[in-house]
Amino acid sequence: MKFHYQKTGRVTIGWVAMSEVEITVGATIAYKLSKCPLISCPQLNVIAQYVHNALHGMSEITFATAKCHADDKYDERKGEQIVRTKIYRRVNKLTCRLFEKCCREIIIDLKGRVISVTHE
């Protein structure tokens, strides 16, 4: 996974891309991955680490630091997994998209609700 910053303000780290939504200090962003059995908990921890690194690396741009973890509970019945990102300093604008291995784009809001799923 490569860290990539564009002057448009979008960051792409492997499956994760971020651009612009307002969050406040102390907010927790939950990335909810629905019906994606190919994504295991170790992979989610990798995603969480890359989100952390991206926010840390962009701190001079976004004034953001974050600690991330992946929930180790995987609900087989619902087929979903959650990654949470805790924001400790102010973030001007941030939104998150997670891309999983099936060429599917999942757009999640700040409360962890799936907004849309795109199949290629």
Could you tell me what each predicted segment is?
Residues 1-120:
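Catalytic phosphate/metal-binding cores of nucleic-acid and nucleotide-processing enzymes, i.e., regions
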